[in-house]
């Protein structure tokens, strides 16, 4: 469980939330198996170890969220209640195996048939695993407008953004239900051949529909080599709240922002991820804003005569960029440097992974000795 949850966390942070919800529901549906001391202790250890292994990732995220306000909380891209589907639309799109878009996500024809069979199975005495079917129906409900997502719009669960993301888990569950074949449908060779035929033909139809529906998105080579930033990756909601994204796009080359009456700046260099320049402050102090979107960790190394010191960057209230207050004469190097929390998180992860590996090694060594003694 630890390995699986760690892998999911590294692949997609939001998926941790969804899988955790699924695990919680699974435990509730099968509470008789889980509400035992040894099982609960095993789950607690797995959860704790997962947090330790992901400390290098989770602690920096928590630090950034605590340090400043991001659009994901102040101005979210969407509210989760706005992205759920009417159940009728979900069924129609599934029957048609509609090409996937945010408004047409569906189960596909075969899995939808499996869903219908699962619902019908609830009335049969032959079917043993009715709780599993019940859990499947709860996940289906969570995708639709029947679920009260509006109550969760202003909670951390809003970061899931799109309820149809649960269709991934739902699809795996339905595939598992079909593979169990409690009705004994696939014990005959011809039914297995029919299933393979339906799967292949359904795939062919879906591919044809995909090509036909995307004709308007065909690009020339020149257009392909100059993609819009949105197609590379959006993520606007993880910008600082002060950032005006549209204004930022208009200025492809952002110079240093300062008052020439207060400070003279020369020898400006801007290689990737770094800015350096010489400065001479005319008055007591001067503020210089650099073209870096502010995140905790940007730091300036200032050289003044025979002294060298480090200074943290600050957040500008206008524009959300990183700023620096200077005095005297000197040279500045600005770049992102790992914070103490990031270093501690990395150390926790390395120690926990190393400790786990060492303990497993000792366990295997002990087992090997016991076998030799026998």
Question: Whereabouts are the PLM-identified features?
Answer:
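Alpha-helical structural elements
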Residues: 52, 159, 219, 226, ...
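Proteins with a high burden of low-complexity, intrinsically disordered sequence enriched in S/T/G/P/A and R
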Residues: 1, 9, 162, 223-235, ...
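Membrane-embedded transmembrane-helix bundle of lipid-linked glycan/lipid transferases
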Residues: 1-211, 331-335, 341-374
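Active-site-proximal, structured, solvent-exposed surfaces of multi-pass membrane proteins
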Residues: 247-374
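Membrane-interface segments at or immediately adjacent to transmembrane helices
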Residues: 211-264
């Amino acid at each position: 469980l630890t390995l699986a949850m760690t892998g999911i966390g590294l692949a997609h942070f939001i998926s941790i939330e969804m899988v955790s919800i699924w695990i919680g529901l699974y435990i509730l549906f099968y509470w008789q198996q889980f509400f035992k001391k040894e099982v609960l202790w095993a789950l607690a250890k797995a959860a704790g170890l997962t947090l330790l292994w992901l400390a290098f990732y989770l602690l920096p995220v928590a630090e950034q969220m605590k340090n400043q306000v991001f659009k994901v909380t102040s101005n979210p891209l969407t509210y989760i209640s706005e992205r759920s589907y009417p159940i009728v639309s979900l069924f129609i799109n599934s029957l048609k195996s509609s090409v996937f878009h945010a408004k047409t996500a569906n189960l596909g024809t075969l899995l939808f048939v499996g869903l219908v069979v699962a619902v019908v199975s609830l009335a049969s005495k032959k079917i043993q695993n009715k709780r599993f079917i019940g859990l499947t129906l709860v996940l289906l409900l969570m995708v639709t407008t029947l679920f009260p997502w509006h109550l969760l719009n202003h909670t951390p669960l809003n970061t899931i953004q799109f309820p149809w993301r649960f269709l991934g888990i739902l699809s795996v569950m339905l595939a598992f239900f079909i593979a169990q074949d409690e009705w004994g449908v696939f014990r005959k060779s011809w039914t297995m051949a029919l299933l393979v035929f339906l799967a292949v033909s359904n795939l062919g139809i879906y591919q044809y529909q995909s090509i036909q529906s995307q004709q308007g998105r065909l690009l020339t080579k020149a257009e392909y080599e100059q993609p819009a930033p949105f197609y590379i990756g959006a993520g606007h909601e993880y910008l600082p709240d002060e950032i005006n994204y549209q204004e930022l796009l208009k200025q492809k080359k952002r110079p240093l922002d300062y008052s020439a009456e207060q400070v003279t700046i020369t020898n400006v260099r801007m290689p990737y991820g770094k800015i350096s320049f010489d400065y001479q402050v005319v008055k007591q102090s001067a503020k210089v804003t650099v073209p870096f979107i502010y995140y905790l960790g940007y730091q300036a190394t200032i050289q003044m005569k025979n002294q060298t010191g480090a200074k943290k960057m600050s957040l500008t209230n206008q524009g959300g960029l990183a700023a620096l207050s200077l005095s005297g004469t000197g040279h500045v190097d600005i770049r992102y440097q790992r914070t103490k929390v990031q270093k501690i998180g990395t150390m926790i992860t390395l120690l926990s992974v190393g400790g786990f590996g060492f303990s497993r090694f000792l366990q295997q060594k002990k087992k090997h000795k016991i076998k030799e003694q026998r």
